């Protein structure tokens, strides 16, 4: 997509390896352990695949959109994604919005460490606010500084609220308090903002214990109540149902999306977003 040199490519791979070794944590507090050997193997394997044809592919000319409605994808690993292991909905939603003819700009302080293919001569907009393994409590502690750093935000896509908290064993009351506080802080940043908040898609059937299933069901009701109570004359808070119709076949592992899951979530977001886009 961009005119990468070998030096920039190697730098990117080093960042990815550090991310894998030190930071990556799948959603719901499940850690991935990577040895030094695995990291080294990953670097060598990736660099060995870097042929001149590959360079041509990633340096294909494309242009950013970066204008129009500013949309912040907010959440944890389901927002961040990690291609090759599991997918984010963002790339599929980005393509859907291009197909719809909308002008928009994904915003956030995080940028992907990997490349996505260009689409219709546009470069993928890789900015987001997805942080793997983070809880609503952690997001609540940081959302104000993130919003300040980004500046203008018109729409927030609030993914899987309370999901990681639940798997960390947090009390429902604490989850509710943190999600409410996040919404309050977003609206304080922009009193005219639109917030689209998920009724989260479930994990794999074999993974959903009785305790998780109960909390999952409770959170569906909680999200509806929060949206209703936080809506103002100038700020819409809209629920999007990601649970109905979501199946085990849409998961790459116990809780993360595969390609089909990412496309499903993107379509739900797209249909909810359209009335709020210029």
Could you describe each region identified by the protein language model?
Residues 38-48:
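Bacterial N-terminal signal peptides
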């Amino acid at each position: 997509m961009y005119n990468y040199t070998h030096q920039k490519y190697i730098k990117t791979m080093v960042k990815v390896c550090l991310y894998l070794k030190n930071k990556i944590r799948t959603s719901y507090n499940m850690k991935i352990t990577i040895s030094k050997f695995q990291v080294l193997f990953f670097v060598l394997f990736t660099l060995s695949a870097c042929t001149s044809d590959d360079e041509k592919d990633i340096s294909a000319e494309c242009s950013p959109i970066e204008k129009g409605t500013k949309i912040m994808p907010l959440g944890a690993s389901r927002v961040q994604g990690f291609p090759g292991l599991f997918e984010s909905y963002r790339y599929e939603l980005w393509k859907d919005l291009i197909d719809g003819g909308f002008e928009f700009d994904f915003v956030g302080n995080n940028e992907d460490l990997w490349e996505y293919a260009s689409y219709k001569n546009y470069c993928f907009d890789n900015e987001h606010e997805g942080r793997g393994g983070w809880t609503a409590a952690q997001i609540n502690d940081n959302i104000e500084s993130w919003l300040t750093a980004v500046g203008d935000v018109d729409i927030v896509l609030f993914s899987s609220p309370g999901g990681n908290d639940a798997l960390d064993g947090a009390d429902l009351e604490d989850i509710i308090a943190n999600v409410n506080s996040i919404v309050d802080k977003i609206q304080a940043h922009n009193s005219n903002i639109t917030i689209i908040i998920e009724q989260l898609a479930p994990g794999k059937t074999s993974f959903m214990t009785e305790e998780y299933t109960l909390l999952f069901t409770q959170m569906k009701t909680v999200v509806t109540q929060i949206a209703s109570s936080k809506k103002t004359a100038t700020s819409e808070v809209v629920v999007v149902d990601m649970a109905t119709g979501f199946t085990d076949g849409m998961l790459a592992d116990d809780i993360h999306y595969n390609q089909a899951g990412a496309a499903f979530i993107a379509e739900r977001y797209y249909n909810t977003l359209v009335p709020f886009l210029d």
